[in-house]
């Protein structure tokens, strides 16, 4: 089999490339996906409120685990990644957050990445998006990704938590993806007008499937990329449960879109990576690139949980006897509790004035439960997910063998910097100040987690080590740039070889301030134009907020109550 392009991975980036490249009728594309179809009748992936279910099994989740994390009580920590058409957009939390403008301006300050400024990227965010309330300078109206905004009549806890953040002295913003990300406000979600998950399989692949120049093969596990000298010429993959070896050839390019965990694995198995590692595993060296699998970054977060004095939380939706009614309303009407991911409010703040742009993110949830659906509190409650955005900690990914079925060695090295500890302690204390504000007086009960007895630095640190979890945002493991640890250039082309690009979250040079999915889609849209030889979209001239000397917060309405005195 021979095609112009072979795309490895039908995820958030791969599906964008498949759709955009096949817009050119004279181009043939093979899309390889290790997982299966995105079954549209499977509520576990299609119902927004069921977002925890795919993380509990292995049909849609690679279910990686880290090596023992040395600063986290040597815990082996979850590292869920999507498997199936849609990739991680098939199992993520559907939060539509793009990052802060300053993230992209920081990228553009690095050598070789000058065209990755916020105003260069904004047109591609807009190109990808259809927002339900219409386009403006920041939002699109004709893109494949359906974005839904929170609606009047949603849970009162969302409004109370935003109001509490403002009363604590932080800004309010009406659009976390608009002029000013900093502050508290409503959170958009990647959900269709009919209440279905808006994965890239639904948004992009559905447009491309009817084209006869696109071939999609599922249950195709990539073994390695093939080379003639320094040129990528094809892909060796294993088909189906039997693992039958198959080979496909690329006339133009191989496009690796495996994500921040799989892409460095595939490069290393293919002979591109740290020379010493490949030599140890008897993998023939094609190109020594020491940065492959290095610079690994993620967001770590904690849950601060509270009981709710009024029966307005989503606790009843967790009870089995209420779930059939919720499911029926969602299935036939696309409305109700099932049609929302329930992350409809959040925010970004600077924990200290020294930060140039927000370093802490909040997701507010009107129920007390772990992200993966475990450890639900058996009473009315609510919680704040809070974590730092740009940790100095860096990890790595290394293959253990040539076998593509074997999971790699993953180490994020969470909380390895003193800055991490300062930020997480600040985050807990600031969250308690927010929860103590008058807006939450009608709802606030006791603090369930960490609990009123967790107060000093040592107690907070012990809680963080034992309870902080991944936000499922691995990135930066094949970073773009032109320094000695860069893996790709600003167009995703792998250094030192020809005919091979990496296009996914792994090529971010530094993790962004927020959830990764929207930015991963933007990256693929932008590089797709480069691959096709199209003129880049014109830079935006939209104004955007820069904090400058603006204080991180003003005086709160209520100075923090002692945790034990919460009414």
Swiss-Prot record:
Any one GO BP annotation for this protein: glycine betaine biosynthetic process from choline
Catalytic residues in the record: 473 (proton acceptor)
Keywords: FAD, Flavoprotein, NAD, Oxidoreductase
Cysteines joined through disulfide linkages: none
Signal sequence segment: none
Reactions it catalyzes: choline + A = betaine aldehyde + AH2; betaine aldehyde + NAD(+) + H2O = glycine betaine + NADH + 2 H(+)
SUPFAM superfamilies given in the database record: FAD-linked reductases, C-terminal domain, FAD/NAD(P)-binding domain
Transmembrane segments: none
Alphabetized InterPro entries for the sequence: BetA (IPR011533), FAD/NAD-bd_sf (IPR036188), GMC_OxRdtase (IPR012132), GMC_OxRdtase_N (IPR000172), GMC_OxRtase_C (IPR007867)
Protein function: Involved in the biosynthesis of the osmoprotectant glycine betaine. Catalyzes the oxidation of choline to betaine aldehyde and betaine aldehyde to glycine betaine at the same rate.
Protein name: Oxygen-dependent choline dehydrogenase
Organism the protein comes from: Yersinia pestis (strain Pestoides F)
Gene: betA
């Amino acid at each position: 089999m021979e095609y112009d392009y072979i795309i490895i991975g039908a995820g958030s980036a791969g599906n964008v490339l498949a759709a955009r490249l096949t817009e050119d009728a004279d181009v043939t594309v093979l899309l390889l996906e290790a997982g299966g179809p995105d079954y549209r009748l499977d509520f576990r992936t299609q119902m927004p409120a069921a977002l925890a279910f795919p993380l509990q099994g292995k049909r849609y989740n690679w279910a990686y685990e880290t090596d023992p994390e040395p600063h986290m009580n040597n815990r082996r920590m979850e590292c869920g990644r999507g498997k199936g058409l849609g990739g991680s957009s098939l199992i993520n939390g559907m939060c539509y957050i793009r990052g802060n403008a300053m993230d992209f301006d920081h990228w553009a300050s690095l050598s070789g990445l000058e065209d990755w400024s916020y105003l260069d990227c904004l047109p591609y965010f807009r190109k990808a998006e259809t927002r339900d309330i219409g386009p403006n300078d920041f939002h699109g109206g004709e893109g494949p990704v359906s974005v839904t905004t929170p609606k009047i009549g949603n849970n009162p806890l969302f409004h109370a938590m935003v109001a509490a953040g403002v009363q604590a002295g932080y800004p309010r913003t009406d659009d976390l993806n608009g002029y000013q990300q900093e502050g508290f406000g409503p959170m958009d979600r990647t959900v269709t007008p009919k209440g279905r998950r808006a994965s890239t399989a639904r948004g992009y692949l559905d447009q491309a499937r009817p084209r006869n120049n696109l071939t999609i093969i599922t249950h195709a596990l990539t073994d390695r990329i093939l080379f003639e000298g320094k040129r990528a010429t094809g892909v060796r993959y294993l088909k189906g449960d039997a693992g039958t070896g198959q080979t496909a050839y690329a006339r133009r390019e191989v496009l690796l879109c495996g994500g921040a965990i799989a892409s460095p694995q595939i490069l290393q198995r293919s002979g591109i990576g740290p020379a010493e590692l490949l030599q140890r595993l008897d993998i023939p060296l094609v190109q020594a690139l020491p940065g492959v699998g290095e610079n690994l970054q993620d967001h770590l977060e904690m849950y601060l949980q509270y009981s709710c004095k009024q029966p307005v939380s989503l606790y009843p939706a967790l009870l089995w006897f209420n779930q059939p009614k919720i499911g029926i309303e969602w299935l036939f009407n696309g409305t109700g509790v099932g049609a929302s991911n329930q992350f409809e409010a959040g925010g970004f703040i600077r924990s200290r004035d020294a930060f140039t742009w927000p370093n802490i993110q909040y997701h507010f949830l009107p129920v007390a439960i772990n992200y993966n659906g475990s450890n639900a509190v058996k009473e009315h409650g609510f919680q704040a997910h809070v974590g730092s955005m740009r940790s100095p900690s860096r990890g790595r990914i290394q293959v253990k063998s040539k076998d593509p079925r074997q999971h790699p060695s993953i180490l994020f090295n969470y909380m390895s910097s003193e800055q991490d500890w300062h930020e997480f302690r600040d985050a807990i204390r600031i969250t308690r100040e927010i929860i103590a504000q008058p807006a939450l007086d009608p709802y606030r009960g006791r603090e369930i987690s960490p609990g009123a007895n967790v107060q000093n630095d040592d107690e907070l640190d012990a809680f963080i080590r034992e309870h902080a979890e991944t936000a499922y945002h691995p990135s930066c493991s094949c970073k773009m740039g032109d320094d000695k640890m860069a893996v790709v250039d600003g167009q995703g082309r792998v250094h030192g070889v020809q005919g091979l690009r990496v296009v996914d979250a792994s090529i971010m040079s530094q993790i962004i301030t927020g959830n990764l999915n929207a930015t991963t889609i933007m990256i693929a849209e932008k590089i797709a134009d480069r691959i096709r030889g199209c003129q880049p979209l014109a830079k935006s001239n939209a104004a955007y907020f820069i904090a400058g000397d603006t204080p991180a917060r003003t005086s709160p309405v209520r100075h923090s109550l002692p945790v034990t005195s919460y009414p």
